[in-house]
Structures are given as structure tokens and as C-alpha cells.
Amino acid sequence: MAIIRGIVLYTRQYKDNDLLVRILTETYGMRTFLARGAKKATSKLSAGTQPYTIVTFDGALPKRETGLGYMNDVQDIKVYSRLIEDIEANAYAALIASLIDASFEEGEKITRWYNQLYVALQKLDEGLDPQIIANIFEIQLLVPLGVAPNLRADPITGQVDGKFDYSEKYNGIISEHHFNLDDQRLMLDQKTVFYLRQFSVIDMRQVHDIKMSAITKRGLQRVIDYIYEKQVGLKPRAKSFIEQMHSWQNTLVNFRRNK
């Protein structure tokens, strides 16, 4: 038995009243725990199995890397109310959780990412822009996902200042002096390039109220989506839901304008 602390990423039903709980633990990496009876209304485990809850529990680690652990008794929980009540914040939290889950092996020690996610959930609960929080994860998780685009300097000259654009051909940014080498570059505006580069290295603790225009947000999301489609080949269900949600919002805005 052990006292285990972690962040609940998601749950899956297992038999009638049991749940499989996917948890990013503080110490033991990504693990799946069986919570017997957690779906019962009277279960003491119920509150500790809600997605994006910080939970400390008495349990057992899997005996094998791919096996199940057990959640026996919840000691302490921290719940973020906005992530329950705000559908947009909840959707972006789900996207971040899906990407982290896809990026690392079972049991791989990823304390840095535990800390990043812990702070990110706090930021989301405080009302910071959920798209910006998710964009930071989308960009930084490209490295463990095996893409690792070069966003630091021009690959030909090492230039770090000036105007840049994103090139799939060169797997990252190229300076304006080499725009002619790739006629398929993304033609990004410089504010988008700035945030793309900044978000690749920023620590979540440094993120405060970032103000970004709607145009720049769309541009940044466009390049991120391009990289995930063309180079990663990953699109979580939460991503599709977010796109549908934005489509509904745009339809509603246009309807109100035309009334």
C-alpha cells in the first residue's frame, strides 16, 4: 500500500459500479487505477475520481508496468469549480489531458509535466484564456510527441532575430532571407511567429493575463493545427469538440448580427 498523489485525467467505466481512473501521478508517472464502487452515489471514492481533480489516496501501484493499480481510500481532494461549470474551460482541460496521455509511456517519470499541468489547472480555474493555456501545451508537447520543430533560430545561419516564417520543409522557422527556399511556407504574420516561439519555452508559472488579438489567436491555432495534422497525425476527440463548439459560437454570433 502507498499514499499516492496525482491529477485525474479521465475515467472509463469498468463493470457496473467500478471505474478505471487514469491519473498523472506526482511521483510514478501515468498510471491507471481501479476504483471499485466509485459510481455508487454513496461511494467515498466518487469525489476523488472526477476529471481534473487533484487527489491524494491510499492505494496500490500496478505490479507490472501495464497492469492496474488500486484506489482504496481517498485522503484529500482539490476540485476546480470552473472546470466543472465552464464548458469551454472543461473542453480545453480535456484536450491538454489527452495530449499528455498520448505523449508519454506508462510509468515514465514526468514530474515537470505534472507540475505544468497542476499550475495550468489553477490558471484555468482563475479564468485565464483556456485556448492560450492549451496552445502552450500543444506547442511544448511536440517534443515528446517526436516532432520537435526548431523554433529557436534559422537552421541555415543560426539567426535568432528578425522576421521568420514556419516551414515544414525545414521543420521549423526560417528567416526572411530564406523565404525563397520554401514556397510552401505558412506566410505567418510576425505576432503569430512571436507567440509560437515564446510559447515553446515559457514556464506555466510565468503565464499571467496574456492579451492576444482574435486574428493572432486564429493564426497561432492555424499553425499548431497544421503541425499536428501534417507532422504528428494526432487529433484527440476533445479537439473535434472544441472545433464544433467554436462553430456553434460563430453561428450564434452571425445569427444575432442578422436579426
Swiss-Prot record:
Key words, A-Z: DNA damage, DNA recombination, DNA repair
Annotated Gene Ontology cellular component terms: bacterial nucleoid
Species this protein is from: Leuconostoc mesenteroides subsp. mesenteroides (strain ATCC 8293 / DSM 20343 / BCRC 11652 / CCM 1803 / JCM 6124 / NCDO 523 / NBRC 100496 / NCIMB 8023 / NCTC 12954 / NRRL B-1118 / 37Y)
Tree of life domain: Bacteria
Name of the protein in its database record: DNA repair protein RecO
Pfam families: RecO_C, RecO_N
Entry similarity comment: Belongs to the RecO family.
GO terms, biological process: DNA recombination; double-strand break repair
Signal sequence extent: none
Role, per record: Involved in DNA repair and RecF pathway recombination.
InterPro entries, A to Z: ARFGAP/RecO, DNA_rep/recomb_RecO_N, NA-bd_OB-fold, RecO, RecO_C
